[in-house]
């Protein structure tokens, strides 16, 4: 199957999803740019769009080449409560970078907001909605294609975000950073999905905090909740690029390896192909990743779902399906690995003789 660029007028996000098309999101920005030296851990704010625009542009380009057809603005935690006077310039610059790269392929631009830093301490609906509305005004000015409210651990705040984003004429997606146990107020994933759709979201799901397997379990519960309530919405999943089956209700942030010792937990490209297929079989059509999800992980989604999409991404020009490029290797035992069965059944070692398989969460 040859790579293709899909020329022509771009369809909107809902038009794509309603036709059954697979939409591939992007992946990790904060964790990846921290590793590359452009984001400060702890603050996790996106000044890099102004201070190091080439680094952000390059990462967008890598995701586009890997198969992403959504360029999400790098505006995580870019609200006034986190960035004070810099918030407006950061949001505007992030939109410009995402639009520039999206224009090089069949990609849409999504303006992204996330949970605020003040909800846990002061549930001031008017103040929180004002913060969301400020970012929305920039997204409208920059004419993003649709909107994403992501990384919400409380459904009440996520509903407030959806209500604000619905003030625009753009489609709204919302993802919560919850596992099968539900949000931090013990509201089930199914009930969370119902409340979000009733608030006006067209696309619902989960992102971050949990690995692919756990995130798909949560998606199944969301889907069941919507079906039981007689509601319809498109489903979206963007998990970690890490394995974290041992984390607690708060997700990987409670693991002792977070954030600087997660490398031994990185999912392989083959893990991600399995995740992509399982997500598709569950009925999810917006499939991407979050923290730890590198461009090669996105390529794995695009390759696994190439039969459904009808084309491969440009990055597949240098990548043989299921290791097929290894059949040219000079060593016979490496040539023997040029097959799906080998990689699909491999249980990778960590190389650390005293490394435990699982950790005990700190919280």
Curated annotation (Swiss-Prot):
Residues 11-305 form the Hcy-binding domain. Pathway: Amino-acid biosynthesis; L-methionine biosynthesis via de novo pathway; L-methionine from L-homocysteine (BhmT route): step 1/1. It is an enzyme of class 2 (transferase). Binds 1 zinc ion per subunit. It catalyses: S-methyl-L-methionine + L-homocysteine = 2 L-methionine + H(+). Signal peptide: none annotated. Zn(2+) binds at residues 208, 290-291. Its EC number is 2.1.1.10. One of its GO terms (cellular component) is cytosol. Involved in the regulation of homocysteine metabolism. Converts homocysteine to methionine using S-methylmethionine (SMM) as a methyl donor. PANTHER family: BETAINE--HOMOCYSTEINE S-METHYLTRANSFERASE 1 (PTHR46120), S-METHYLMETHIONINE--HOMOCYSTEINE S-METHYLTRANSFERASE BHMT2 (PTHR46120:SF3). Homotetramer. May interact with PRNP. This is S-methylmethionine--homocysteine S-methyltransferase BHMT2. It comes from Homo sapiens. The lineage of its organism: Eukaryota, Metazoa, Chordata, Craniata, Vertebrata. The gene is BHMT2.
């Amino acid at each position: 199957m040859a790579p293709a660029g899909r020329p022509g007028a771009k369809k909107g996000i809902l038009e794509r999803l309603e036709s059954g098309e697979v939409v591939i999101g992007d992946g990790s920005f904060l964790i990846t740019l921290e590793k590359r030296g452009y984001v400060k851990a702890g603050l996790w704010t996106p000044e890099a769009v102004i201070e190091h625009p080439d680094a952000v542009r390059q990462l967008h380009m890598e995701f586009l080449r890997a198969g992403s057809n959504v360029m999400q603005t790098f505006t995580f935690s870019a609200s006034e409560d986190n960035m004070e006077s810099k918030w407006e310039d950061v949001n505007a610059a992030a939109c410009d970078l995402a639009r520039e790269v999206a224009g090089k392929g069949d990609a849409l631009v999504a303006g992204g907001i996330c949970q605020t830093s003040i909800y846990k301490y002061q549930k001031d609906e008017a103040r929180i909605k004002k913060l969301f509305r400020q970012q929305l005004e920039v997204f409208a000015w920059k004419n993003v294609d649709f909107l994403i409210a992501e990384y919400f651990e409380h459904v009440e705040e996520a509903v407030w975000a959806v209500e604000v984003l619905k003030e625009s004429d753009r489609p709204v997606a919302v993802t919560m950073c919850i596992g099968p146990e539900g949000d931090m107020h013990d509201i089930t994933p199914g009930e969370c999905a119902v409340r979000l759709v009733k608030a006006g979201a067209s696309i619902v799901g989960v992102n971050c905090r949990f690995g692919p397997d756990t995130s798909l379990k949560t998606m199944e519960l969301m889907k069941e909740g919507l079906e039981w309530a007689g509601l319809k919405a498109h489903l979206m999943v963007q998990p970690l690029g890490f394995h974290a089956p041992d984390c607690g209700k708060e997700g990987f942030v409670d693991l002792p390896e977070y954030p600087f010792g997660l490398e031994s937990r990185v999912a392989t490209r083959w893990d991600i192909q399995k995740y992509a297929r399982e997500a598709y079989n569950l009925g999810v059509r917006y499939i991407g990743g979050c923290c730890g999800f590198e461009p090669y992980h996105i390529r794995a989604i695009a390759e696994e779902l190439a039969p459904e999409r009808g084309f491969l991404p440009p990055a597949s020009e240098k990548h043989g399906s299921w290791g097929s490029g290894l059949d040219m290797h000079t060593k016979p035992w490496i040539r023997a690995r040029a097959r799906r069965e080998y990689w699909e059944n491999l249980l990778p070692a960590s190389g650390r003789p005293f490394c435990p398989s699982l950790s005990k969460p700190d919280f």
